[in-house]
Amino acid sequence: MSGKLTVITGPMYSGKTTELLSFVEIYKLGKKKVAVFKPKIDSRYHSTMIVSHSGNGVEAHVIERPEEMRKYIEEDTRGVFIDEVQFFNPSLFEVVKDLLDRGIDVFCAGLDLTHKQNPFETTALLLSLADTVIKKKAVCHRCGEYNATLTLKVAGGEEEIDVGGQEKYIAVCRDCYNTLKKRV
């Protein structure tokens, strides 16, 4: 039986990692073997753990290239969990397809859009393959409504790949994005 791909996406501060961690917990409670991964580039909260903004976390294999996952996935692995997929190169798509064909469920969390509203290529590829998409929203940093679907960069230059937290990025709704973008 083929595995299923679930992609959790949305802006920063929308609870993507928290949702991913809840699926890890469900698999562990079900006594299913899991493998958890994060990109080496993301060491904001911890170097070897996936940690949510709320502080919850789980140990993870830290890798640079998606192909490195294969050495950590054992014959009896039932679930693979990957955080911050936007930071991986597009070869993650082929690795995930292989895992699904092997009957392993895969859960991915990551940003869908850059702060310039351009799609992250790796996330877009995974969304095209997904059996289930969970599109998260956040509370808009400016108006306070629970309608934020975009991430706005407020400090640190224009680079689209620039790891950071609240010191660089805020979640905003489209109206507030357009208003604030004129000022930034």
From Swiss-Prot:
Provide the reaction this enzyme catalyses: thymidine + ATP = dTMP + ADP + H(+)
What processes does the entry annotate via GO biological process terms?
Answer: DNA biosynthetic process; thymidine metabolic process
Q: Where in the cell is it found?
A: Cytoplasm
- Effect annotated for changing residue 53 to A: Reduced affinity for ATP
| EC number annotated for this UniProt entry | 2.7.1.21
Active-site residues (renumbered): 84 (proton acceptor)
Cellular component, GO, one term: cytosol
Please classify the protein's predominant subcellular localization into one broad category.
Answer: cytoplasm
Instruction: Supply the SUPFAM superfamilies for this chain.
Output: Glucocorticoid receptor-like (DNA-binding domain), P-loop containing nucleoside triphosphate hydrolases
Identify the keywords attached in UniProt to this record, alphabetized. ATP-binding, Cytoplasm, DNA synthesis, Kinase, Metal-binding, Nucleotide-binding, Transferase, Zinc
Residues annotated to bind Zn(2+): 140, 143, 173, 176
- Give the top-rank taxon of the lineage listed in the UniProt record for this protein: Bacteria
InterPro entries tied to this protein: P-loop_NTPase, Thymidine_kinase, Thymidine_kinase_CS
Check the record and name the HAMAP family matching this protein: Thymidine_kinase
**NCBIfam families per record:** PRK04296.1-1
Q: Which family does it belong to?
A: Belongs to the thymidine kinase family.
Q: What is this protein called?
A: Thymidine kinase
Q: Which species expresses this protein natively?
A: Thermotoga maritima (strain ATCC 43589 / DSM 3109 / JCM 10099 / NBRC 100826 / MSB8)
The gene for this chain is tdk
